[in-house]
């Protein structure tokens, strides 16, 4: 197995940038489309545990104004083979001292890369 193949890392880097742009713009069609369209996809958030794409899409649609603005402090990307990648982001919400973390597991399907599992948390229990 090839770990951290440069071409796969480049693809995942582009996806990470696209995701961050969509998140900050509250571009729901793009965000929803980046997740695996399955009842088996999982997103564990700061105040919610979401199972299945319908739950994830409903959460995003009901969130007024989308995700709070943030800046990325650090990002790491790893790939395992050509069809599995992990993106971890350390972020800080604008105007807040608390540090947040985001982890995404990406799998390449026939239709392209999709997030199959995601986790978002804040350090220190703050919101």
Label the predicted regions.
Residues 39, 89, 104:
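Conserved GNAT-family N-acetyltransferase fold
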Residues 4, 11-14, 42, 46, ...:
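Surface-exposed, charged secondary-structure patches
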Residues 19, 31-32, 52, 56, ...:
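Hydrophobic pocket/interface hotspot
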Residues 86, 99-127:
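Short beta-strand edge/turn micro-motifs at domain boundaries
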Residues 35-36, 91-93, 119-122:
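Short beta-strand segments enriched in hydrophobic/aromatic residues
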């Amino acid at each position: 197995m090839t770990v951290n193949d440069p071409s796969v890392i480049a693809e995942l880097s582009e996806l990470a940038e696209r995701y961050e742009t969509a998140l900050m713009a509250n571009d729901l069609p793009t965000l929803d489309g980046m997740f695996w369209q399955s009842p088996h996809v999982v997103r564990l958030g700061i105040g919610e545990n979401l199972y299945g794409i319908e739950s994830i899409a409903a959460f995003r649609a009901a969130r007024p104004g989308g995700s709070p603005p943030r800046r990325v402090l650090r990002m790491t990307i790893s790939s395992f083979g050509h069809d599995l990648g992990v993106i971890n982001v350390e972020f800080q919400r604008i105007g807040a001292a608390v540090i947040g973390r985001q982890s995404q597991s990406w799998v390449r399907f026939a239709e392209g890369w999709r997030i199959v599992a995601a986790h978002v948390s804040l350090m220190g229990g703050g919101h």
